[in-house]
Amino acid sequence: MLKNFMKNKKGAVGIGTLIIFIALVLVAAVAASVIINTAGKLQHKAAVVGQETTQQVASGLQVVKITGHSVDQYNLDKIAILVSPNIGDEIDLATTVVTFSTDDRKMSLLYDSSNASNGGKVRLSTANGTSDIFKYDDVYAIGAWPFEDPTYGQSDQDPNEKKFGIVVLQDMDNSVSGEHPTVNYGDKVLLAINIGNIVGENIGNRIRIQGEVVPEFGAPGIIDFTTPPVYANRVVALQ
């Protein structure tokens, strides 16, 4: 009888050990599941942050050149900013902001998407080029230059709106349209700014102008120039 009792006791101890072992396995499995889920979330977050960082570092716009249009020796009425995107993701110019500041004022300009279905404030010159980037082009409904132009015609733009238009110089995949003016690496466009109408008066001589062309994400293009003492020619290199 004693021998049978000892056998039963050993069996009970073995079952208890097995239960403890199973419990440990279950706890370890739950812990492993939590760790795996956490690692997955952290990996996803790291990938998103890495992608956003890449966009901020690699993407953006660079100001290649700035040219002005003078009406006489002392007055500048238009500015054309030649921009091109950096290597990186495409840039939507519809969400791009152009800032200007002088000694006594600062302004922010947005893309003029009015009448976008008919081309908006975009003039395409990629096919045949253009004889005059500052010319108001009524072939494209309103043309790239906002506001009234007494020389070449008129637009229905409200002078109180701070807007810019676009002249397309190079766009191999036709990504720049009135509704979605999107540029990618290799594209070149002019941001058409009728500065005289926006400010309310033409820009005089020896005026320091600073600003940025700020895309939705990525590095901004820098604007920094001083207008010359005299506008000797109708077309003036500013930066």
Swiss-Prot record:
Please list the GO biological process terms of this entry: archaeal or bacterial-type flagellum-dependent cell motility
Record carries keyword Glycoprotein: yes
Instruction: Explain the post-translational modification.
Output: N-linked glycans consist of the 779 Da trisaccharide beta-ManNAc(Thr)-(1-4)-beta-GlcNAc3NAcA-(1-3)-beta-GlcNAc.
Principal localization?
A: other
Which keywords appear in this protein's UniProt record, sorted alphabetically?
A: Archaeal flagellum, Glycoprotein
The UniProt record lists the keyword Glycoprotein: yes
According to its UniProt record, where is this protein located? Archaeal flagellum
Gene Ontology CC:
archaeal-type flagellum
Q: Which GO terms describe its molecular function?
A: structural molecule activity
Spell out the residue numbers of the propeptide.
Answer: 1-11
Q: Where on this protein are sugars attached? A: 115, 128
Q: Which PANTHER family match?
A: FLAGELLIN B1 (PTHR35903:SF1)
List the NCBIfam families. arch_flag_Nterm, PRK08541.1
Q: What does this protein do?
A: Flagellin is the subunit protein which polymerizes to form the filaments of archaeal flagella.
**Which family does the entry's similarity section mention?**
Belongs to the archaeal flagellin family.
Please report the name of this protein according to its UniProt entry. Answer: Flagellin B3
At the highest ranks, the source species' classification is: Archaea, Methanobacteriati, Methanobacteriota, Methanomada group, Methanococci
